Amino acid sequence: HIMQPLFDEKTMEVHKKHLQDRTNVRSPLATNEVGFDPRTGFPNNFIGGHVTMKPVIASHFNYRASLIRQMEWHGIRWRALPSESRDLYLHFRSLDLSAVDRIMLDCYSARGPKPRQPSCMLRSLLIMVATKCPTIPQWVETLHVSPFYALLSGFDPDDVPGVGTFYDFLDRLWALSTPNFSSHIKPPYKRELKKPKEKGAKAASVEKESVADLIVRLSTTVFSANQEAYGLMFQIFRTCFVNESIRRGLVRPDRLCIAGDGTPVVTAARFRSHHTCDCWKKGIFNCNCNRFFPQPDCDIGWDSSREHWYFGYDLYLLTDADSQLPLFPALHQASKHDSHGFCEAFFRFRALAPDLKPASLLLDSAHDSMAMYKLCQREGITPYIDLNLGNTKKTTDYHGVTLGPDGIPVCPAGLKMKSNGNDLNRQYAKFRCPLNNNGTCTCEHPCSDAKYGRTCSIAMETNIRLYTSPPRPSDEWKLMYNKRTASERVNKQIKLDYMLEACKHHCTKYLVCPRLSYHDADPPFQMEGPVIHMTVA
């Protein structure tokens, strides 16, 4: 509904005729494109004795003032707009993107044609995502048809940027010289696809490097925002959105609880490649020569939710579990295992946002490995990771006590013993008789002379993966782990509500575009509309 023109054809003709009658009068937005310094009287872009073509750093107050004057100039009353357009107006009128002009100042040359304001370009892309417009050409057409969207973006309706201008802006956000992470020319893709045996299970890892070796390698790697492909975009995301959420009390850095999860991103229906040799002319069709891959960063992965193979990416997202707001996205190949995807995202997030140190970590059973617990122990993080019984031996023996695959002792009657908390001073996990009823053992064949039944204490250092603090079966652990579903809700919102999979681009650069996540919240003070939090997907 909000993609329809705000005026009918007759009203638009009257509107255009009214503007033609005032051709000699410049609109308020046009007269405020370049401000003047009140001390010198020169324009703000008059630097070093000449006029520079770098973007003018404008404040959010100037944008709001120009927006109000422009809407009055064009006869648009925001209270008379449809409810969807009115919500957009309230959201983006309060969204401060003035820091984008300062951050991207070095991305523009001092010579050449005058550029568009980076804050207006980014705001227009965010409005495009909010209105679920799938492509940039369709969005440019919408800006020409509906003046409201042009005004809300910060443009003059008679001077709307073209399609190439938007793609040029996306090129400036991308730090690499190539549009993809890898080369188009690769050896032929030959991998045996093995479907998981259990329903809902994830595919086995195809990584040649173990999680422990990957953690060691990433720990010694230096990550810089200037070297990362999306480093500039994350700097904008951190400055304009994450810091604003921290200021409003939605994200609390002192007790940050991070939930991580990966989600499939489908980009094509099938895997495609082209021959770069002439072996087919000789009758050789299955040669081992290099192939040309249109989407070199994509491959085949397993979607455990829909239970089918897909071609595309794997989006791994670190989410604040308390506020259900995204913190850091990472885009990998579809075959990337979640444990490796987490390590890639975690170490980059730690390097690009060193002041945001997580206090707890919520992960599913795909991340269950001893190396992950040792990483959390070294970083001072409390892990809440679901146990993967496939990574544990069936039965073990600990000083005459039989342990199950989940590390819980099993009494001679074949019953699992109940957790009795942890002794943190002595670093012991305590267990008691499962038939203990109000301090009395009700077992018909007690295995201990004690009145309250048999007890068992196991050193937590024996296996920090099995004996966690708080204990895995406890109510405290379960209550905390239930917050992990926040990452799944955010993934769903990015993919479905904001149409991430609708971006059918053949390169990673144009897929890495701003995506919005709207979350209703009750901040400690009054604000206009829901909180806006952006993810770079």
Regions found by a protein language model. Name each.
Residues 19-22:
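Short hydrophobic targeting helices and cationic amphipathic motifs
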Residues 35-121, 126-130, 151, 157, ...:
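Dynamic "connector" segments at or just before major functional cores
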Residues 168-360, 365-378, 386-388:
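Polybasic low-complexity intrinsically disordered regions
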Residues 138-153:
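DNA-recognition alpha helix
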Residues 374-491:
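Helix-centered, glycine/charged polyanion-binding patches within enzymatic domains
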